[in-house]
Amino acid sequence: MAKDAEDFKTSYESLWTELRILYEYDQISENMLLNPIRRIIETFTKFNALDKTTFCNKVSGAKKLFDVNSHSIDDIEAELNGKTKQEIIQMFYDCFEKNEYGTHFFKYWGNAHVDENGNLVMSSEES
């Protein structure tokens, strides 16, 4: 059991690390963030016995955006609707925050904070 928990922790942390790296590199397109986000949400909701749809539906457009390319690659560009990496990560954060798991997001994301308007602000320091 302890080995399974350790494997889960390592895999889950790796998803967050992957997401942060993809976010930070300018050469990486916005759509590359969606797969690790979807995998993080699926893992998090399953591990915590939460309904994934309910978790995402508290943020307008999140479920649709984060499900893009989960079954087909054809619609990915059309579905982004011009969202920036910052807007995508904001939606991702909002899903955690609106489900009362904002501290969980910060534990894994690293250096960031929320401004007085509820916007996620990234730190310029390495995490």
PLM region spans:
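Acidic, Mg2+-coordinating catalytic modules of nucleic-acid enzymes
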Residues: 1-127
